[in-house]
């Protein structure tokens, strides 16, 4: 399969790589759309880590459902790129982002788990979400950044009538402004 990886400061390289196979029940996805996150830009600007295949805001079609019996080939899905332990206090309370293991094998954020700047990617089966009919692949890529924005707004405990300052006009900031309304 074709993929794009970091090859140096502000440099990418288009290369061939083996298509991922299901490991530990992971779901294999034919990537149809992938967002560009601010963290992707930081990696590109720094040129580190060399070899990283970025892309953690993605949507596509199931080609191998792995251990998910409720998924079938052809289902439209998106995935959460994280890899929480599901055992610690943070995970047990649903706060996966605070798990110390969440980012160790994150899709498109670690050298161990290639992201969606590729024709195919893999994702933990418990982190896959079906895309409702009528939602485009491009819109489905916004699930992850939407969750980040919504979480930030919820942490702020904004009430009706509050004045809110959001610093940053990127996608996270714009979504936070919408959620804060």
Please tell me what each predicted stretch does:
Residues 7, 18-19, 50-55, 108-113, ...:
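Short Gly/Pro-enriched turn/cap motifs at secondary-structure boundaries
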Residues 37, 71, 80-129, 133:
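Cysteine-cluster motifs in flexible loop/terminal segments that predominantly coordinate metals
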Residues 2, 26-28, 163:
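Residues that mark the start of a beta-strand
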Residues 19-34, 45-92, 132-134:
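Glycine-rich beta-strand-centered segment in the early N-terminal region that forms part
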Residues 39-43:
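Cytochrome P450 core scaffold surrounding the K-helix E-X-X-R motif
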Residues 8-10, 23:
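Residue-level recognition of beta-strand termini and adjacent short loop/turns
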Residues 135-181:
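Mid-domain Rossmann-like dinucleotide-binding core that forms the NAD(H)/NADP(H) cofactor-binding site
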């Amino acid at each position: 399969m074709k993929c794009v990886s970091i090859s140096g400061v502000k440099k990418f390289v288009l290369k061939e790589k083996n298509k991922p196979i299901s490991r530990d029940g992971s779901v294999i996805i034919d990537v149809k759309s992938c967002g560009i996150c601010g963290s992707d830009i930081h990696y590109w600007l720094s040129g580190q880590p060399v070899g990283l295949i970025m892309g953690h805001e993605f949507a596509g079609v199931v080609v191998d459902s792995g251990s998910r019996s409720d998924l079938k080939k052809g289902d439209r899905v998106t995935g959460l790129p994280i890899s929480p332990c599901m055992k610690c206090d943070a995970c047990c309370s649903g706060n996966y982002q605070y798990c110390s293991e969440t980012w160790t094998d994150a899709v498109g954020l670690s050298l161990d788990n290639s992201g969606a700047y590729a024709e195919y990617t893999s994702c933990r089966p418990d982190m896959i979400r079906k895309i409702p009919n009528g939602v485009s692949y491009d819109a489905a890529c916004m699930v992850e950044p939407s969750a980040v924005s919504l979480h930030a707004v919820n942490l702020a405990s904004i009430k009706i009538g509050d004045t809110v300052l959001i610093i940053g006009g990127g996608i996270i900031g714009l979504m936070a402004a919408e959620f804060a309304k």
